[in-house]
Amino acid sequence: MTTTAEQAPAAAPQAFSKAPGTGVALVTGASSGIGEDTAHKLRALGYIVYGAARRTDRLQALTADGIRPLAMDVTDDASMSSGVNRILEETGRIDVLVNNAGYGSYGAIEDVPIDEARRQFEVNVFGLARLTQLITPHMRTRGSGTIINISSIGGRLTTPLGGWYHATKYAVEALSDALRIELSPFGIDVVVVEPGGIRTEWASIAADHLEATAEGSAYADQIRDVAGAMRSESNRRHYSPPEVIARTVGKIVTARHPRTRYAVGFMAKPLIAARRVLPDRAFDQLIGAAFGFRR
């Protein structure tokens, strides 16, 4: 009988060992940056790795390392179900899920079209949640598994003109906390990774989205300041390479008891600490200055 994403195999559960060289991993958003490096890291640890993205042409370079490309659109339920079914049919298991697919769409709350805000939630939140729904029944049956949600320090603090993006990441943090509690009795670890400044395409893509909202906007000066900070090479040269996130994922999947959260990358820990201890208005001033706001 064909195994489906909604129904785990009927075979007797086999516990997953966290020793390197065992298991099957699925990484979304694997065509570049954090996802690509994470797929390579898991492969180096001995996993059978499926790297998923909407466009498989951008995944072909992964095949040289033995990574299996998987066409998957996290906004399309049929696409996700088909991808999960393929993995289960080929391997009979999914031991690690890395929910990495996502993007940042910046702009003033007033300016961003509500359809774009919805799309960002579809990719960053509902896609993550639905893929998790498809895989957790299988992990529960096996009595083990690791779900790693790539969030952001943007799920712990807010930057100018990023309200819609930050709302998606705050949602990921909350969903992850609930999942961790719900899935713990079944032997499934749920871990959040919160990248700080990482040297990927993310900032330039977010700046493109932001600048698209500038024409005729009452927030044009703020848009110019924030987009400039995002594109600044003087900022980017301090950013951490995406390998730091991949190495963190490697630590998580081999740890007997991984931490619930890992803040990693340029300024991740200091900014989260500052948000925790500073009053709201003091933090507003700090983060505004970092983005070059003129008052």
PLM feature spans:
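The beta1-alpha1 cofactor-binding region of Rossmann-like NAD(H)/NADP(H)-dependent oxidoreductases
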Residues: 72-82, 114-115
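Active-site helix of classical SDR
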Residues: 132, 168
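C-terminal beta-strand-loop-alpha-helix "lid" module of Rossmann-like NAD(P)-dependent dehydrogenases
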Residues: 185-235
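Substrate-binding pocket helix/loop in short-chain dehydrogenase/reductase
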Residues: 108-109, 116-118
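Residue(s) in the substrate-gating loop at a strand-loop-helix junction
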Residues: 152
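A glycine-rich helix->loop->beta "capping" turn
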Residues: 86-99, 105
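Conserved glycine-rich cofactor-binding loop
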Residues: 31-32
